[in-house]
UniProtKB/Swiss-Prot annotation:
Keyword Ribonucleoprotein listed: no
Family annotation (NCBIfam families): gshA_cyan_rel (TIGR02050), PRK13516.1 (NF010040)
Catalytic activity: L-cysteine + L-glutamate + ATP = gamma-L-glutamyl-L-cysteine + ADP + phosphate + H(+)
Domain of life: Bacteria
Name of the protein in question: Putative glutamate--cysteine ligase 2
Function of the protein: ATP-dependent carboxylate-amine ligase which exhibits weak glutamate--cysteine ligase activity.
Length: 372
């Protein structure tokens, strides 16, 4: 399929996607019943969309195009009420988190969807293994060239986004010792990590044309990059965050990305170059492994900085942009999180350290989601 022209969208508008866990009480393992919930809510959602993701244990909640985080929060809140009622009617529960702490990937059923079945044919068992749960944020751009500039700018802050959203310390019944283990699942994919270097939209079109020769890439949706342009929507999509445990944190993360995008495209503070990516995977690893306690390294100077310090610096830089787009509350909440030194991964470990079981942890996550 040829790459569509870049659809011009209103700059800095938002679209947010949350991949939620569908679980079966009282054992709180993953359920294979997302199709039941989708059928139950399909005529009750007035804004946004509830739909399938790769496997039947995943339920995606997606907003419409939103002006700001307040509009997005309102849409999510309305969807949440409908989904929670449908889940209760079918003896299911819903929660966030980047991974289910003890599910077995071998049990996961790929959705009966042409695209997902084609992906299963291409990637085999890897598709069942990617039963992990992330938050994706789309930001509107006025042109393809703006999208490429924004993608490179946001890529500088991938470690910050990962550390602030880290919520996947447990996998397959084991403490992984990572704050965010979810991104590791994609490491076997040939398109894992950052997008190959291009400097403008024309070069991106040539890149996509080359990738399509492999026959594994039919559309942008088939690419698993950390951040990717979405020409159909006229957006840049950030894909590195774990699904938070609360709607409020999900909205705050979206506000962070929206404000960062506003700062980047308004101020144009960087002259991007390919060398920017030399230490990308090392810095990304630091955020996944250690969360806010990680250390990132500047590929140009060799300077090493605590991720906590650099995140506070970012929040300070984007504060004026956040004020202009109505996202100041998000930046203030994230500032408090950084100062506290906590992320959701640490809260999960604290629960288990205090004697909680992994079953109890999922139950707790369901209570948190329903109570937010």
């Amino acid at each position: 399929m040829p790459l569509p022209d870049f659809h011009v969208s209103e700059p800095f508008t938002l679209g947010i996607e949350l991949e939620m866990l569908v679980v079966n009480p009282p054992g709180y393992d993953l359920s294979q019943d997302s199709s039941i919930l989708i059928d139950a809510v399909k005529n009750k959602i007035t804004a946004g969309e509830v739909k399938h993701d790769i496997t039947e244990s995943m339920l995606e909640l997606a907003t419409d195009v939103c002006r700001d985080i307040n509009q997005a929060a309102g849409q999510f809140s309305a969807m949440q009420k409908v989904v929670l009622q449908a889940a209760a009617d079918h003896h299911l529960e819903i929660c966030g988190g980047g991974t289910h702490p003890f599910q077995k990937w071998q049990r996961q059923e790929v959705c009966d969807n042409e695209r997902y079945q084609r992906t299963l044919e291409n990637f085999g068992y890897l598709i069942q293994q990617v039963t992990v749960f992330g938050q994706h944020v789309h930001v509107g751009c006025a042109s393809g060239d703006d999208a490429i500039y924004l993608l490179h700018g946001l890529s500088r802050f991938v470690p910050h986004f990962i550390a602030l959203s880290a919520a996947s310390p447990y996998m397959q019944g084991t403490d992984t010792r990572f704050a965010s283990s979810r991104p590791n699942i994609f490491s076997a994919f040939p398109d894992n990590g950052p997008m190959p270097w291009v400097s403008n939209w024309q070069q991106f079109e040539a890149l996509f044309r080359c990738l399509s020769y492999t026959t594994m890439i039919d559309s942008i949706k088939d690419l698993h990059w950390d951040i990717r342009p979405s020409p159909h929507f006229g957006t840049v999509e950030v894909r590195v965050m774990d699904t938070p445990l609360t709607l409020s944190h999900a909205v705050n993360m979206a506000g962070l990305i929206q404000a960062t995008a506003h700062w980047l495209l308004t101020e144009r503070p960087f002259k991007h170059q390919e060398k920017d990516y030399l230490l990308y995977k090392f810095n990304r690893f630091q955020a996944c492994r250690y969360g806010l306690e990680g250390v990132i390294t500047d590929p140009h100077t060799g300077d090493r900085r605590p991720l906590t310090e650099d995140t506070l610096r970012l929040l300070e830089k984007i504060a004026p942009s956040a004020h202009k787009i109505g996202a100041s509350s998000a930046i203030e909440a994230l500032h408090r999180q950084v100062v506290s030194g906590l992320n959701e991964a640490q809260l999960m470990r604290d629960f288990v350290a205090d004697g909680g079981s992994l079953i109890g942890l999922v139950k707790k996550h369901c209570e948190i989601w329903a109570g937010d």
